[in-house]
C-alpha cells in the first residue's frame, strides 16, 4: 500500500454556497477551503478546526470577492477518531459564514440604493436629463478667462517694457563706454600735443634769446659807429691841412656796411635755419600726429568691435549659465526622483526579503510537518505490510495444510513444504529536495526478497538526496 501526495494538500471548493469535502489515506484532512460569491464588498473570516497551523488570504472588490483558508493537520489530528465530528463542525461554520456573507451583500445593496436615492434627491434639478447643469458657472468661467487673458497681456507688456528698458540701458552703457574710450584717446592726444607744444616753446625761447643777443650786438655796433662818426666829424670841422705821404686810411663806412651786411646775412641764415628746423619738426610732428590719429582710430574701431563681441559673449554666457542652471535643476530633480525610486526599490527588496525569509520559515515548518506526516505514513505502511505478511503467511499455511490433506504438494522453488517461506519487501524512499529545502519529487523503489524466516519484515530506507 502506498500514498501519493500532490503538493501536500487536498482541495475543498465552493462556488455557489455548497461545500464539497474530500479526504484520503487514514482519515486525515489537509487542504484549502475556497469560497467565491458575487458581492461588491470584501470580507475575511477565520475557520478553526483541528489544524495546528494554517494560512488565510482574502481578496475582493468589483463584482466578486472571495476568501480562502488553509488547514494542515498534524500527527495528533491524523490519529484522532473525531474526523466526522470535525468535518460536520466545519460544514456548519461554513454554512453560517455563507449566510453571514449573503446578509452582508443584501445590507450592502440596500445601502447602495439608499445612497443613490439620496444623491438623486439632493442633486440640483430633479430631471435625469439635467442632473449636471453647470450653465450658471459659464459666465463666471468666461469672466475668469477674460481676467486671465488681460493679466497675461499686462504681464507680457510689462515683460516687453522691461526688455526694452534693459536694451536701452545696454545701448546707453555701450555709448558711454564708447565716449569714455574716445575721451581717453583725446586726452592722450592732448597730452602728446602738450609735450610737442612745450618743445616748440623751448625752441622759440632759444631763438628769441639769440635774436635779443644779436639785437644788442647790433645796437652796440650802431652806437660805436655813431661815436666814431661824431669824432670824425669834430675832427674834420677844423682848418688844419696836413699833408702826409702815407698809406690811405680805411673807409669806416664801407667797413661798417660790410659788417652790417655780414650780420644781416648771418641773421637771415639763422632765421632760415630756424624756420627750416621748425618746419621740419612741425612736419615730423604732424606726420606723427596723423599716424597716431590713424592708429588711434583703428584702435578705437577695434575696441568698439571688441566691446560688441564682449557684449555678445556676455549675453551668450548668461544664456549658457541659465541653461546650465536649468540642467543642474533638472539633474538634481532627476537624482531626487531616482533616489526616491531607489529607496522605494530598496524598501520593496527589504519587504521581499522579509517575505522570502517568512516563506523559508514557513517552508521549513511545512517540511517538518511533511516529514512527520511521511514518518506517520511510513509507520502505517509498515504496519499494513506486517499485517499483509501475517495474512499471507496464514493463507499459505492453510493452503499447505489443504494440499497435505488432499495428497498434493505445492511448488516452492526447491524448498521443502515444511519450510514456510516469507517474502521480504525492501522499499527505498528517495526524496529530491532543492537548495532551500522544498520537496521536488518522491520515488519509492520496492525489491522483493524471499527468506525462510517469518521474522524478516519490511525494511525501508530513507535516502535524502539534494537536487542539483
Curated annotation (Swiss-Prot):
Coiled-coil ranges per UniProt: none
Chain segments carrying region Coil 1A: 83-118
GO CC list: cytoskeleton; cytosol; extracellular exosome; intermediate filament
Residues covered by region (Linker 1): 119-140
Keyword S-adenosyl-L-methionine: no
InterPro entries assigned to the protein according to its UniProt record, in alphabetical order: IF_rod_dom (IPR039008), Keratin_I (IPR002957)
Biological process annotations from GO: epithelial cell differentiation; intermediate filament organization
Entry's transmembrane regions: none
Ranges where the record places region Head: 1-82
Alphabetical keyword list: Coiled coil, Intermediate filament, Keratin
Residue ranges constituting the IF rod domain according to the UniProt record: 83-398
Region (Coil 2): 256-394
Tissue specificity remark: Strongly expressed in skin and scalp, and weak expression observed in thymus and tongue. In the hair follicle, expression is restricted to the mid- to upper inner root sheath cuticle, being present slightly above the apex of the dermal papilla (at protein level).
Pfam families: Filament
Coil 1B: annotated span: 141-232
Annotated spans, Linker 12: 233-255
Domain of life: Eukaryota
PROSITE patterns reported for this sequence: IF_ROD_2
Membership in a protein family: Belongs to the intermediate filament family.
Note: There are two types of cytoskeletal and microfibrillar keratin: I (acidic; 40-55 kDa) and II (neutral to basic; 56-70 kDa).
Subunit annotation: Heterotetramer of two type I and two type II keratins.
Name listed for the protein in its UniProt record: Keratin, type I cytoskeletal 26
Organism: Homo sapiens
Amino acid at each position: 500500500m502506498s500514498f501519493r501526495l500532490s503538493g501536500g494538500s487536498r482541495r475543498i471548493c465552493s462556488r455557489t454556497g455548497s461545500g464539497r469535502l474530500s479526504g484520503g489515506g487514514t482519515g486525515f484532512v489537509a487542504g484549502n477551503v475556497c469560497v467565491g460569491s458575487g458581492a461588491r464588498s470584501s470580507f475575511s473570516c477565520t475557520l478553526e478546526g483541528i489544524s495546528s497551523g494554517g494560512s488565510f488570504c482574502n481578496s475582493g472588490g468589483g463584482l466578486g470577492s472571495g476568501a480562502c483558508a488553509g488547514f494542515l493537520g498534524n500527527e495528533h489530528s491524523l490519529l484522532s477518531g473525531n474526523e466526522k465530528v470535525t468535518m460536520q463542525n466545519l460544514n456548519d461554520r461554513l454554512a453560517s459564514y455563507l449566510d453571514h456573507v449573503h446578509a452582508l451583500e443584501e445590507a450592502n445593496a440596500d445601502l447602495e440604493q439608499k445612497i443613490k436615492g439620496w444623491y438623486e434627491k439632493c442633486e440640483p434639478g430633479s430631471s435625469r436629463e439635467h442632473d449636471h447643469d453647470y450653465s450658471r458657472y459659464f459666465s463666471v468661467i468666461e469672466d475668469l478667462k477674460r481676467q486671465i487673458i488681460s493679466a497675461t497681456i499686462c504681464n507680457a507688456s510689462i515683460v516687453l517694457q522691461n526688455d526694452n528698458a534693459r536694451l536701452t540701458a545696454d545701448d546707453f552703457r555701450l555709448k558711454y563706454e564708447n565716449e569714455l574710450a574716445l575721451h581717453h584717446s583725446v586726452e592722450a592726444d592732448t597730452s602728446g600735443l602738450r609735450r610737442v607744444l612745450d618743445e616748440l616753446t623751448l625752441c622759440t625761447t632759444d631763438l628769441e634769446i639769440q635774436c635779443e643777443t644779436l639785437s644788442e650786438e647790433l645796437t652796440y655796433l650802431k652806437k660805436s659807429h655813431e661815436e666814431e662818426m661824431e669824432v670824425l666829424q669834430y675832427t674834420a670841422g677844423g682848418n688844419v691841412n696836413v699833408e702826409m705821404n702815407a698809406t690811405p686810411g680805411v673807409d669806416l663806412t664801407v667797413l661798417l656796411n660790410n659788417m652790417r651786411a655780414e650780420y644781416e646775412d648771418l641773421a637771415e641764415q639763422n632765421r632760415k635755419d630756424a624756420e627750416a628746423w621748425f618746419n621740419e619738426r612741425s612736419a615730423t610732428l604732424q606726420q606723427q600726429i596723423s599716424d597716431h590719429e590713424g592708429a588711434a582710430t583703428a584702435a578705437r574701431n577695434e575696441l568698439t568691435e571688441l566691446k560688441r563681441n564682449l557684449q555678445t559673449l556676455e549675453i551668450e554666457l548668461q544664456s549658457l549659465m541659465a541653461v546650465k542652471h536649468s540642467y543642474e535643476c533638472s539633474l538634481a530633480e532627476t537624482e531626487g526622483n531616482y533616489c526616491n525610486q531607489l529607496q522605494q526599490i530598496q524598501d520593496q527588496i527589504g519587504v521581499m526579503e522579509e517575505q522570502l525569509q517568512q516563506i523559508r520559515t514557513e517552508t521549513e515548518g511545512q517540511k517538518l510537518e511533511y516529514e512527520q506526516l511521511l514518518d506517520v505514513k511510513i509507520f502505517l505502511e509498515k504496519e499494513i505490510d506486517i499485517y499483509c505478511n501475517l495474512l499471507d503467511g496464514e493463507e499459505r499455511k492453510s493452503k499447505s495444510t489443504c494440499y497435505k490433506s488432499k495428497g498434493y504438494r505445492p511448488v516452492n522453488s526447491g524448498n521443502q513444504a515444511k519450510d514456510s517461506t516469507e517474502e521480504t519487501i525492501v522499499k527505498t524512499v528517495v526524496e529530491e529536495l532543492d537548495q532551500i529545502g522544498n520537496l521536488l519529487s518522491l520515488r519509492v523503489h520496492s525489491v522483493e526478497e524471499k527468506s525462510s524466516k517469518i521474522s524478516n519484515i519490511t525494511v525501508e530506507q530513507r535516502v535524502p538526496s539534494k537536487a542539483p
